[in-house]
Structures are given as structure tokens and as C-alpha cells.
């Protein structure tokens, strides 16, 4: 049974967040956490927070099942564009340049590995 966590209106551009999301797509949760901890991208903190929330949601939905991070994997992760705040910057000769402050919505779905690999 899968679990989902959504982080809405994150003040980061979707393009920057998608770079970090691509790092953990399809990976086991313990490996994804290690990747995010060692990432230098600012968006990795938000992805880590949402991933931990998804793991907690999985534990909440399956109270009688005890699973570790090795048995869970990131099934899907995607970044949608959120609201865009439009600001103006004064420019020469009485003009104004438009600044678009973008935001995004991050969705992470985790699930249990069907056939876990044992070492």
C-alpha cells in the first residue's frame, strides 16, 4: 500500500526542484535520504522533509506493519508549477522590468518493494 506526501507553494523555481527530484526518483528511501543529505542544492532540504513525511504517512496508514527504510522506495516524485508572484524592477528611461518569483508543488509517493533483494 502506497503513501503520499505533498509540499505546496515552495518558494523555489520548479526547474531547480526537478533537478533534486531526479536524483531520488526510483531509489530506496534509505539511499534517497543519503543522497539528499549530501546534496549541496538548497531544494534538497524541502525534498528531504517531504520524503520523511511520506514515510511517516506510510507508517500511519499501516500501523500493524513494521517496515524499515530499506523496504520502501520512491515510487513517483514530480514537481508541478505553483503560483507565480509578479514583481517589477525599475529600469532606465521610466520603464519597468518584470520579475517572476516562481513557486512549485512537490509530490512524493512511496511504496513497499515487491521483491526485496537480500544480501
From Swiss-Prot:
SUPFAM superfamilies: Ribosomal protein L22. Signal peptide: none annotated. It holds the Pfam family Ribosomal_L22. One of its GO terms (molecular function) is rRNA binding. Keywords: Ribonucleoprotein, Ribosomal protein, RNA-binding, rRNA-binding. It comes from the Bacteria. One of its GO terms (biological process) is translation. InterPro entries: Ribosomal_uL22, Ribosomal_uL22_bac/chlpt-type, Ribosomal_uL22_bac/org-type, Ribosomal_uL22_sf. GO terms for cellular component: cytosolic large ribosomal subunit. Part of the 50S ribosomal subunit. Belongs to the universal ribosomal protein uL22 family. This protein binds specifically to 23S rRNA; its binding is stimulated by other ribosomal proteins, e.g. L4, L17, and L20. It is important during the early stages of 50S assembly. It makes multiple contacts with different domains of the 23S rRNA in the assembled 50S subunit and ribosome. This is Large ribosomal subunit protein uL22.
Amino acid at each position: 500500500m502506497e503513501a503520499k506526501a505533498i509540499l505546496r507553494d515552495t518558494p523555489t523555481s520548479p526547474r531547480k526542484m526537478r533537478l533534486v527530484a531526479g536524483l531520488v526518483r526510483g531509489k530506496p528511501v534509505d539511499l534517497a535520504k543519503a543522497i539528499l543529505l549530501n546534496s549541496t542544492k538548497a531544494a534538497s532540504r524541502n525534498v528531504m522533509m517531504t520524503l520523511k513525511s511520506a514515510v511517516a504517512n506510510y507508517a500511519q496508514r499501516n500501523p500493524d506493519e513494521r517496515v524499515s527504510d530499506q523496504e520502501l522506495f520512491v515510487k513517483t516524485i514530480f514537481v508541478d508549477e505553483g503560483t507565480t508572484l509578479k514583481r517589477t524592477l525599475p529600469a532606465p528611461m521610466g520603464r519597468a522590468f518584470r520579475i517572476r518569483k516562481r513557486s512549485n508543488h512537490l509530490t512524493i509517493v512511496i511504496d513497499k518493494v515487491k521483491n526485496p533483494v537480500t544480501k
